[in-house]
Regions:
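N-terminal [4Fe-4S]-dependent radical SAM core
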Residues: 1-18, 28-30, 61, 260-271, ...
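Canonical Radical SAM [4Fe-4S] cluster-binding loop centered on the CxxxCxxC motif
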Residues: 10-49
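Conserved beta-strand segments that form the floor/walls of ligand-binding pockets within enzyme
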Residues: 16, 20, 68, 99, ...
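Conserved, mostly hydrophobic/aromatic
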Residues: 21, 25, 29, 69, ...
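Radical SAM/AdoMet-radical enzyme domain recognition
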Residues: 46-69, 77-190
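Conserved G/P- and acidic residue-centered "switch" motifs that form tight phosphate/ATP-binding loops
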Residues: 73
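Radical SAM enzyme [4Fe-4S]-AdoMet core and its adjacent flexible, acidic
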Residues: 130-133, 138-145, 149, 153-271
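Flexible mid-to-C-terminal extensions adjoining Fe-S/redox cofactors in radical SAM and related proteins
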Residues: 274, 278-351
Length: 351
């Protein structure tokens, strides 16, 4: 099957697929998942590794060139290594990446590298061990830091570290940015995006009387614009005698830079990026679709519009799978409508 470029209704090249391989996780982050996890699904409700790989093979013929594996936590899935191998064997796929909390990277990094994984994104919202424990419920800061070190040691390139900034929650952005001084990582600050539907966030709360730890109480005022973040980081740098962030030449941006805009401290080993999903949304350049663990294609993270390919895959009806895919691409919205919200937990979407 020869590959070609597929455009959506607004002329965007659809070349990037994010796949939630599981909705399970070894953490219980307050903005992502209820404290007791998501309701377990019957095995036959979820796509098998073989079905996922076959779907990727089909849409690679429609122009997909980059694949990101997400969850939940993709590394808790026993099928993650063979799945990466199968996707790596698809000639049109140029890049395979994975988003993780990092806790299992020290154990799995060698196998992931051998299977053909190119790069990783690691989630890290704070350097305060106590706050880290409250945000993740089950995680420890040293686990994620060890995961970052393992990713660097095993030569994944680039290693990106993602921090979602919520005004009333995590305040140590300056310290996080300084991790790039001696580590060749790309620390990206992501503006908090209020999804609008409190059904999910109210089930994630740690303490209904502690607003900072209750996502149901977060609102648009908790979004910290990238310009404000950069000013806070520069103020923190000045306080310890460092120079201000300088803009990075676009040609020096890390692979898969996507919507992030990158800066760096003078002489630093890494970079600092800003993803301005709210203050300067990047929908006009969005080239991605998502596949959920139960076999639904989502054209947009912030819409509940889904197109199920599971039954067609199981019937072996490749033409029907492609017809559903093309329909999903054709209905990708021009821009997100965050106010509409979503009926799924973030761990089920693979956001």
């Amino acid at each position: 099957m020869d590959g070609h470029v597929q455009h959506d209704g607004f002329g965007r090249d659809i070349n990037y697929l994010r796949i939630a391989v599981t909705d399970k996780c070894n953490f219980r982050c307050i903005y992502c998942m209820p404290a007791d996890g998501v309701a377990p699904r019957a095995h036959d409700e979820l796509l098998s590794a073989e079905e996922i790989a076959r779907f990727v093979r089909l849409v690679a013929g429609e122009g997909i060139r980059r694949v990101r594996l997400t969850g939940g936590e993709p590394l808790v899935s026993r099928r993650i290594i063979p799945l990466i191998r199968d996707i790596r064997a698809i000639p049109q796929i140029e890049d395979i990446s994975l988003t993780t909390n990092g806790a299992l990277l020290p154990k799995l990094a060698p196998q992931l590298k051998d299977a053909g994984l190119n790069r990783v994104n690691i989630s890290l919202d704070t350097l305060d061990p106590t706050l880290f424990g409250k945000i993740t419920r089950l995680g420890r800061l040293e686990q994620t830091m060890a995961g970052i070190d393992a990713a660097l040691a095993w030569g994944f390139e680039p290693v990106k570290v993602n921090c979602v900034v919520v005004r009333r929650l995590n305040q140590d952005v300056a310290a996080l940015a300084r991790l790039t001084l001696d580590r060749p990582i790309h620390l990206r600050f992501i503006e908090y995006m209020p999804i609008g539907d409190e059904r999910t966030s109210s089930h994630c709360a740690v303490d209904p009387h502690a607003p900072a730890l209750n996502p149901a109480l977060w609102d648009a005022s908790d979004t910290v614009p990238s310009d404000e973040l950069r000013a806070r980081i520069n103020a923190g740098a000045a306080a310890v005698g460092l120079g201000e962030l300088e803009p990075l030449d676009i040609n020096d941006a890390p692979a898969g830079a996507g919507p992030a805009r990158y800066w760096h401290f003078p002489g630093a080993a890494g970079t600092v990026g800003f993803i301005s999903a709210m203050s300067n949304h990047f929908c006009a350049n969005c080239t991605r679709l998502r596949l959920t663990a139960d076999g639904n294609v989502r054209p947009c993270l912030f819409s509940d519009a889904e197109y199920s390919v599971r039954d067609a895959l199981r019937r072996g009806d490749d033409m029907q799978v492609l017809s559903i895919w093309r329909d999903a691409v054709a209905h990708k919205p021009q821009e997100h409508a965050i106010i509409e919200g979503t009926q799924r937990f973030m761990s089920q979407i693979g956001g």
